[in-house]
């Protein structure tokens, strides 16, 4: 397979200190005279020679199906007698703390917020007011000091203990999203010229991407908190980890059918008639991301297949893959294995390309 990952553009969002207004505001509000330790980084990538499902799968995993971290408050972490309003702390302050973008690798860190407003004016509480109370000493900040957490009226206080680092995935809580603002387009579908905008579809394509088979794609996204000195290293790690997550989830499916001749609850395999075989595979805690990959790659491997489809069953937290084809049970499993190997190979090559493109 040719090189999949064709090009990458990495652009950090930096404060424009050459602008006097921005420079003065940064110094007045946050005593900043240099760039923040963490910066949002926009990444645009071009891929060639793969189907839409692979790019869509990478996009989905990078955004909300890969483990990441957020700040959260442990039960009992509020000092009720000292805090302004427990309801506001739970519904407003906690939400603000959750969504502070962080770059964390150590889950043993604990922070606290102890703020008192002795002035006659409303006081703004920022993330810089969080203090570390447990865990190893930080060599580098894990969040920027500039995020608004809340406001204090004169004479009021806000005391929150046990603000800890929690691990999870974005599809269960948006604060865990590793990447944001993901979007992708197809570069090999003819588009309307810009001077014909009044005639074009909203997508800009002359042919619907739903009925075409694009093989040249552009994926864009933003990582909201990347250490300024290690931008390329962090982006490379994120992309490689996403490939490994997909490979790992696909490989777990192989275990379901590797001993297909033995009865097992996750696999139902039977002959419908003298020619057709039907396979029903139940995969626990799986999503449309993997379902779409399997469906697309199986179709590419078996163009004359009778049927392949999947259904996510939310209340059971499982995905059901159904395949019907004119083949023996053994041959059908062999074709499924070849399809899965193609998915694994795609993301192994993509992972290798990441190392080649991002130094």
UniProtKB/Swiss-Prot annotation:
One of its GO terms (molecular function) is protein dimerization activity. It comes from the Viruses. InterPro entries: RBP11-like, RBP11-like_dimer, RNApol_insert_sf. It is found in: Host cytoplasm; Virion. Gene3D superfamilies: DNA-directed RNA polymerase, insert domain (2.170.120.12), RNA polymerase, RBP11-like subunit (3.30.1360.10). GO terms for cellular component: DNA-directed RNA polymerase complex; host cell cytoplasm; virion component. In the N-terminal section; belongs to the archaeal RpoD/eukaryotic RPB3 RNA polymerase subunit family. In the C-terminal section; belongs to the archaeal RpoL/eukaryotic RPB11/RPC19 RNA polymerase subunit family. Part of the viral DNA-directed RNA polymerase that consists of 8 polII-like subunits (RPB1, RPB2, RPB3, RPB5, RPB6, RPB7, RPB9, RPB10), a capping enzyme and a termination factor. Component of the DNA-directed RNA polymerase (RNAP) that catalyzes the transcription in the cytoplasm of viral DNA into RNA using the four ribonucleoside triphosphates as substrates. This is DNA-directed RNA polymerase RPB3-11 homolog. It comes from African swine fever virus (isolate Warthog/Namibia/Wart80/1980).
